[in-house]
Amino acid sequence: GTETRPSETEGLQDKLWYKDIFDFYTVEGAVALHKRFKDWEGGKLVMAIPELPYKCPVAPIEFVCLAEAYFAERGMRDKVEISYVTLMSGAFTKPVASKVLGDLLEEKNIEVVSDFYMSHVDNENKKIVSYDEREVDFDILTIVPVNMGSDMIERSGLGDDMNYVPTDKHTLQSKQFENIFVIGDASNIPTSKAGSVAHFAAEILTENILAAMEGREMPAKFDGHANCYIETGYGKGALIDFNYETEPLPGTFPLPGIGPFGLLKNTKMNHYGKILFRWIYWHILLKGRELPVEADMTMAGKIRV
């Protein structure tokens, strides 16, 4: 699907790698960060996003929220400055969610540094530097490394310059080869690189493959449906549900007016929903059983703002 490429950012894997600079997308990185946090006495913690797209768009937001709760639990929150540094214009890619999630980070005293296009990491002075020469100091830097598609896709000639397969966003057919269909992170369709996207896309795929084999027009259209829970710390969470045309909006999910989950709301019920989803993943999704959530996104329960 997609892989992290820390070597794509100048200075990232220099002398501070896995000492004061970490990713959490690998076991090695997560374990090294855990050990560093255990004896850390405080300072400037920076979470940086240098490039789009990347696996699970809300993961960095979850990280800073959970880090904030972790340091509060340890009684040292007042000793830690947390910054969320992103090339986006706000906390998220879409305006309504960006405002809500940005306000949530502000409530937690987490600084959002936006429109920061990272050029390199200065290991000597412990700074990240943007192409327009802005600088952000850090004591500990956590980063979402540049994501790229598989080397196999590059070798096959199927991919673009990021090794993702150019794909029709509705039919999921390769734009280059009629006998190839693509779902999940391997495609370049303009939606999240997340498990929910692969799941919803898979539900329309069979119809189109059969139609292509029989020379018929492909009837099924994927709408880019994605949803995900966002852990926010303190036993609470948020939830977003959106597609190509509709950004994440507030409301209730999956039942209009009832929920029990709240869209773009920070609630304990959403946290319980994420915990429940672990069981759903192992006992329903992997066994091919149907979920009571349609592949196409619905506006039912959503409030336009």
For every predicted segment, state its role.
Residues 47-48, 81-89, 225-232:
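Extended hydrophobic secondary-structure segments that form protein cores and membrane-embedded regions
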Residues 46-48, 55-56, 63-66, 70-71, ...:
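Residues forming the flavin
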Residues 72-164, 217-219:
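A Rossmann-like FAD-binding core segment of flavoenzymes
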Residues 239-305:
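C-terminal auxiliary extensions adjacent to catalytic cores
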Residues 183-232, 238-241:
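A conserved FAD-binding loop/helix module that cradles the flavin
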Residues 3-8, 14-41, 135-200, 210-211:
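FAD-site-proximal beta/loop scaffold in flavoenzymes
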Residues 26-80:
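Rossmann-like NAD(P)H-binding beta-loop-alpha module
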Residues 163-181, 232-253:
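FAD-binding beta-loop-beta segment adjacent to the flavin cofactor pocket
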